């Protein structure tokens, strides 16, 4: 298949240079002689057969080889100069391939990385955020820890449905409510450390379906920039009261880029959740109370007290009841708890028991809440978040449910 970017005649190429480059790179460009014939005839207006160009190029190669073998020192210098021209043309092509790589896979990777660089460059202009003035940490004497979980924020979406309304201002109000209630629970439970788990689908995106575009308040890049800045500032404020381990799930269905018409989860690492997490990591790196580990895989795990916890967005889960078992088999590791989001309503499912605690799947509610789609299915639920208290030797003992609308 002819790649018009690779085979286009450059503005600084004469006809012969272009023909030599096309024929020399026949295999690299995945061309056959019929396709080369079409390209050259279209460029020159001629109607020659493929054999004419094939013979012409073979003669050119034979001439080059003859000159290499038989020419004297001065002719060899001229030949080297011609060969150098070919090398320079190739080097120029490599530089131009920042956006258009020769092979399909490397082209996809290059374009994705370029998007990452452009977005990261845009949001990094704010620089690092200086640490705030910290309040003294509580004294945790009961060997307790907590996980604040939320997901499906879908920042950038705006709508009004039967029981819910959503836009940027409402999103900010809900996150402020989560912050306020969390600080209250931190003081109540004497917590000094907190895992903040973001279940992803942080922004609405625009890769799923055309109907998304009608509900967007901002373009995709603006969604990422605004969300990343706000989330970093939100964590900064929360760190005044508690030490934070911020875990951001790096893969979801709304934030996949889905380049070249790829299907869902076909390229799970090409996801702007990774850009968001990296930005938050970088701008908060000077804050001694915030740790932001970065993950490449869509399924992440971490340890809380003696409990092993696994988390993912949830779009890849087919059977919630068997999810812990299946992931434990895949990773060759036993898990006590699992966190998922994606389903836009909170739930808790006990799927087994250990010596001191139940084995549970915790399904996080959505910060966005119900919308027109969930109304049509009659599956809506209140916008919310979830704070779970864990105690050593007992497991998950307390749950605080946040109702945000």
Curated annotation (Swiss-Prot):
Coiled coil among the record's keywords?
A: yes
Superkingdom of source? Bacteria
**Coiled coil stretches, renumbered:** 72-101
- Tell me the keywords, alphabetical order: Coiled coil
Q: What is this protein called?
A: SPbeta prophage-derived uncharacterized protein YonJ
Its source organism is Bacillus subtilis (strain 168)
Name the gene for this chain.
Answer: yonJ
